[in-house]
């Protein structure tokens, strides 16, 4: 049921806004469900799992790994000391060969322990920590009495080295991930559609907040919208490429200062039949991707963002952000997201704009080049000179024929001479009634 506003007009409920496929910060809004053997697959690639996990979870995992290893080997050392009988000896018993406790007699010889000064589980745990971390206080140590204790010390040292190397490698890989470099790559909040070089174009702006370059930087864009095939198959996330200059190399950019990426809306564009009104009612999302290698690590990074139909401003352009100073160029990032409206931007689609240009305003023929124009002038002047020479020669012939001035034939000859046609002059000479005297004179000559 439609609601009513305060002024009495009916209020039409707006259509539910579609969920983003890619968020503005570049994260993909996708949740994986019902994965079979997910834990086994993730544990099979434990290194990538640790690198992809959050810092707090990774620190918890390694802290638990160290604690478990210390407890395990501490329990192992305690068991060795327990079964060897080291825990039953009194701490005050003198060592073998020591002075007597009293009476001047020989002191009883105490059995040599496997681990010196380990009288309980706490002592065994401390010895385990000292062994794995190579602290080496020197108070507790293993004797040659128990080979099993020696083997346990060797195994714990190897396990400690493995855990340390794995932890250091994972932390370094996580810190050097190019994903964090994408945090300093910036996309404009809005995309715009306006006329550039006589054609409607979709434009958005990208920038690099660091002075270090992105090597081999290039951009891509895809339009994502629901699509129904001719067979009735529904595709909720159909992807269409938006050409940003792949064929002529405009997709490769030198990202030192902010650059406006341009998609020309032509016949191959999914936006070709979309005008301003259709844009306001369409349900689509444009995903923009910037890829390149980090200059410091040579690792590939990717920054992503997206624009919904409501985030595309029709008839707007971006404000300039690069200004030339005395000795350098200044980039004002306070203007990075700002746009201004362009008056006179057509509200029709690119198809309608192209058809109107063809039917109403045909393109004028291309002007001749300067070289052709000069040749044409030279040819015209040469033809005029030839016409003047032919006219002079015809006048001399007419004077030799002895025509009477003012006669009709002479007037016709003069007109033909002025016209400059040699063939007409010959036909006129053949039709003139020449007298016998003149003819004989010509023949005699």
UniProtKB/Swiss-Prot annotation:
Catalytic activity: K(+)(in) = K(+)(out)
Motif residue range(s): PDZ-binding: 443-445
Record-annotated disulphide pairs: none
Gene Ontology biological-process entries: potassium ion import across plasma membrane; potassium ion transport; regulation of monoatomic ion transmembrane transport
Main subcellular location of this protein, as a coarse class: membrane
Alphabetical UniProt keywords: Cell membrane, Cytoplasmic vesicle, Ion channel, Ion transport, Membrane, Postsynaptic cell membrane, Potassium, Potassium transport, Synapse, Transmembrane, Transmembrane helix, Transport, Voltage-gated channel
Annotated protein name in UniProt: Inward rectifier potassium channel 4
Tissue: Heart, skeletal muscle, and several different brain regions including the hippocampus.
Function text: Inward rectifier potassium channels are characterized by a greater tendency to allow potassium to flow into the cell rather than out of it. Their voltage dependence is regulated by the concentration of extracellular potassium; as external potassium is raised, the voltage range of the channel opening shifts to more positive voltages. The inward rectification is mainly due to the blockage of outward current by internal magnesium. Can be blocked by extracellular barium and cesium.
Molecular function in Gene Ontology: inward rectifier potassium channel activity; PDZ domain binding
Domain of life: Eukaryota
Record site: Role in the control of polyamine-mediated channel gating and in the blocking by intracellular magnesium: 164
Record Pfam families: IRK (PF01007), IRK_C (PF17655)
Stretches of the chain found on the membrane's Extracellular side: 81-120, 140-148
Intramembrane stretches (start-end): 121-132, 133-139
């Amino acid at each position: 049921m439609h609601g009513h506003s305060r002024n009495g007009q009916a209020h039409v409920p707006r259509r539910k806004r579609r969920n983003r496929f890619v968020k503005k910060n570049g994260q993909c809004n996708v949740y994986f469900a019902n994965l079979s053997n997910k834990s086994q697959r993730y544990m099979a690639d434990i290194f990538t799992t640790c690198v992809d996990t959050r810092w707090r979870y990774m620190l918890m995992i390694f802290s638990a790994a160290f604690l478990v290893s210390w407890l395990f080997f501490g329990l192992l050392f305690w068991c060795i000391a327990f079964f060897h009988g080291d825990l039953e000896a009194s701490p005050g018993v003198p060592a073998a060969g020591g002075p007597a406790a009293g009476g001047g007699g020989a002191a009883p010889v105490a059995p040599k322990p496997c681990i010196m000064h380990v009288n309980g589980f706490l002592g065994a745990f401390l010895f385990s920590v000292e062994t794995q971390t190579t602290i080496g206080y020197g108070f507790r140590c293993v004797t040659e009495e128990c080979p099993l204790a020696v083997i346990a010390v060797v195994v714990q040292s190897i396990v400690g080295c493995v855990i340390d190397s794995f932890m250091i490698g994972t932390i370094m890989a996580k810190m050097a991930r190019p994903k964090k470099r994408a945090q300093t790559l910036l996309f404009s909040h809005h995309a715009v559609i306006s006329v550039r070089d006589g054609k409607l174009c979709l434009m958005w702006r990208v920038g690099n907040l660091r002075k270090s370059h992105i090597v081999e930087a290039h951009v891509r864009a895809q339009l994502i919208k629901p699509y129904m095939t001719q067979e009735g198959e529904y595709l909720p996330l159909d992807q269409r490429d938006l050409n940003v200059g792949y064929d002529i190399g405009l997709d490769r950019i030198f990202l030192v200062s902010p650059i406006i990426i341009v998609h020309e809306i032509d016949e191959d564009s999914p936006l070709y039949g979309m005008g301003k009104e259709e844009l306001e009612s369409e349900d689509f999302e444009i995903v923009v991707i910037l890829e390149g290698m980090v200059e410091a690590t040579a690792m590939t990074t990717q920054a992503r963002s997206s624009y919904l139909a409501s985030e595309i401003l029709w008839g707007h352009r971006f404000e300039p952000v690069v200004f030339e100073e005395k000795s350098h160029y200044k980039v004002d990032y306070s203007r990075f997201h700002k746009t201004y409206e362009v008056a006179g931007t057509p509200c029709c689609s690119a198809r309608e704009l192209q058809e109107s240009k063809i039917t109403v305003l045909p393109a004028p023929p291309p002007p001749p080049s300067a070289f052709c124009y000069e040749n044409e002038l030279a040819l015209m002047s040469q033809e005029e000179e030839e016409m003047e020479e032919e006219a002079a020669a015809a006048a001399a012939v007419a004077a030799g024929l002895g025509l009477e001035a003012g006669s009709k034939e002479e007037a016709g000859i003069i007109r033909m001479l002025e016209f400059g046609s040699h063939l007409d002059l010959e036909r006129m000479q053949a039709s003139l009634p020449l007298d016998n005297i003149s003819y004989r004179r010509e023949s005699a000559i």
